[in-house]
Curated annotation (Swiss-Prot):
Annotated positions binding heme: C445
Principal subcellular localisation of the protein: membrane
Protein name, as recorded: Cytochrome P450 monooxygenase hepD
The EC number(s) this enzyme carries: 1.-.-.-
Consequence of gene disruption: Abolishes the production of heptelidic acid.
InterPro entries attached to this UniProt entry: Cyt_P450, Cyt_P450_CS, Cyt_P450_E_grp-I, Cyt_P450_sf, Cytochrome_P450_monoxygenase
Pathway info: Secondary metabolite biosynthesis
Coiled coil start-end: none
Organism of this sequence: Aspergillus oryzae (strain ATCC 42149 / RIB 40) (Yellow koji mold)
Cofactor(s), names only, from the UniProt record: heme
Chain positions carrying an annotated carbohydrate: N99, N185, N373, N409, N482
Cellular compartments per GO CC: membrane
Topology with respect to the bilayer: Single-pass membrane protein
Length: 500
């Protein structure tokens, strides 16, 4: 009896806890060591190359996501290991152009219509079915509703809205640039424009970012939602219990606050969504009015997709044009000789400007607004990619940044050269089909035509009215972290108004 009492005395109890803890650590370590060895030598993907840590565990991918360098890191892996890389035990990364169709296209003649999205991506956001997160039927249903707003007729009817905001953008630049003597942060300026445009198109009211020269609170909050999604993905690649610990303690508190703010701002804005959007839903829905949660999530999707990605591309275009004066001069000459005055610049006539179109394509290639992987899951029966059978349950994807910047796809991939899209023989071996900046297949970006119109119009009017000069301190501006979207620093530019 005394020995039992001694065992459970303070010192004895601590010894038991220590022993159990050590035993747990040993068993835990041995378990994951065994898993790692299995992944390296016996897993169905064991033959695929990749970093040792990435082949053995998900830690490489989790670390890369958490650091915000997954786009650049994946490119480095492809340059080292080739066109197919194993970036996690159960995930393969591809960069060959033909795999856009194989992974993201319609799966004709199969028992399934598409490769579904990796649930680890959407587990970090609310499970409300939307055009992004819904299954095939849900996606098709919502896409049909929204497609009317992005039809050729609707875009033509809305062109005057683009002109209104782009003209206001040019006016504000003239007022604030002080004849080119004052530096402007074009990262913010482009966000002012694109957020005002999408705010009006989505909610039927202006957010007055251009007139106030102030970013709406929603912008920062919206970007924090994107950061949360990336960090949530990182957590899901960690083993238990570190996934729970990471989500609880490693995600910055300011990110959580901004996500809450984003939710509150959405609640305020929802009542102002144009009635034609809700009416379209009622017309097509068999269940009556659109659920509030679905309406709210689609408002978020339209706002994020229609503002941040377009602003990112325009900022990237400004940077690369500033870094490459000969390209800027060619573009300015084309625009200024094609149009006698500003009033002649229309979306239809901009299709005549071949160098402008090539410049936009090259910007999308060298600085894609959505740089990272969009993983799909292989169905249980498996698929064939690169003449190799990929078993069910494996994640596969085409990371845009890696595919667009790979030396196996593009000649001098780090060179900003619109000429590669104009038949220059120097770039004749480019695999131009690798460039799919709006994704591919039935889930490609619904707003891509609107984005092209806004980008072409804004860029054309910028170079028509201004000579731009990039501040040398922004020479490495494009070396950015990415958490779903790029985290863009200030882009300081002097704008010199062109004399009439």
């Amino acid at each position: 009896m005394n020995s039992i009492s001694a065992l459970f005395s303070a010192g004895g109890f601590q010894w038991i806890l220590l022993s159990l803890s050590l035993a747990f650590i040993v068993v835990y370590s041995l378990f994951y060591l065994a898993v790692g060895l299995y992944n390296l030598y016996f897993h169905p993907l064991a033959r695929y190359p990749g970093p040792l840590l990435g082949r053995a565990s998900s830690l490489w991918y989790a670390r890369s996501l958490a650091r915000g360098t997954v786009a650049q890191d994946t490119l480095k892996l492809h340059e080292k290991y080739g066109d197919v890389v194993r970036i996690a035990p159960d995930e393969l990364s591809f960069i060959q152009p033909e795999n856009w169709s194989a992974i993201y296209g319609h799966q004709l003649g199969k028992d399934y219509r598409e490769l579904i999205k990796d649930p680890r991506y959407h587990d970090t956001v609310k499970p409300t079915p939307t055009i992004l997160t819904g299954d095939w039927d849900e996606h098709t249903f919502y896409r049909k509703i929204l497609s009317n707003s992005f039809s050729e007729k609707s875009l033509k009817d809305q062109e005057h809205i683009l002109h209104h905001f782009v003209d206001l953008f040019v006016q504000r630049l003239k007022e604030t640039s002080a004849e080119g003597t004052r530096e402007l942060n074009m990262t913010d300026q482009w966000n002012y424009l694109t957020f005002d445009v999408i705010g009006f198109l989505t909610y039927g009211e202006e957010f007055h970012c251009l007139t106030s020269s102030k970013l709406h609170d929603w912008i920062e909050a919206m970007l924090c939602v994107a950061i949360l999604m990336s960090l949530g993905q990182a957590a899901r690649h960690l083993p238990f219990p570190f996934d729970k610990i990471y989500k609880q303690w490693a995600i910055p508190s300011n990110v959580k606050r901004q996500v809450a703010l984003h939710r509150d701002l959405t609640e305020v804005a929802i009542p102002h969504i144009p009635i034609q959007y809700a009416s379209a839903y009622r017309l097509n829905s068999r269940k009556g009015d659109i659920p509030y949660s679905v309406l709210k999530e689609h408002a978020n999707i339209l706002t994020i997709g229609g503002s941040e990605t377009t602003a990112t591309l325009l900022a990237g275009a400004t940077f690369h044009l500033g870094k490459n004066p000969p390209v800027l001069q060619k573009l300015a000459t084309e625009i200024r000789t094609t149009f006698v005055n500003d009033g002649e610049i229309t979306v239809a006539r901009l299709s005549e400007c071949k160098y402008l179109l090539a410049t936009v394509e090259e910007c999308l290639r060298i600085y894609p607004p959505s740089p990272a992987n969009h993983t799909r899951m292989v169905p249980k029966e498996g698929i064939v990619l690169n003449d190799q059978h990929i078993p069910g349950g494996i994640g596969v994807g085409m990371p845009m940044y890696a595919a667009f910047r790979a030396s196996s796809n593009f000649t001098y991939p780090d060179r900003f050269a619109p000429e590669r899209w104009l038949g220059d023989p120097m770039y004749s071996k480019d695999k131009k089909g690798a460039l799919q900046p709006f994704s591919f297949g039935p889930r490609n970006c619904l707003g891509r035509h609107l984005a092209y119109q806004e980008i072409k119009l804004a860029l054309a009017k910028l170079v028509y009215h201004f000579d731009l000069e990039l501040n040398p301190k922004c020479g490495d501006w494009d070396e950015q972290k990415n958490f779903t979207f790029w985290v863009k620093p200030p882009l300081w530019v002097n704008l010199h108004p062109v004399k009439s």
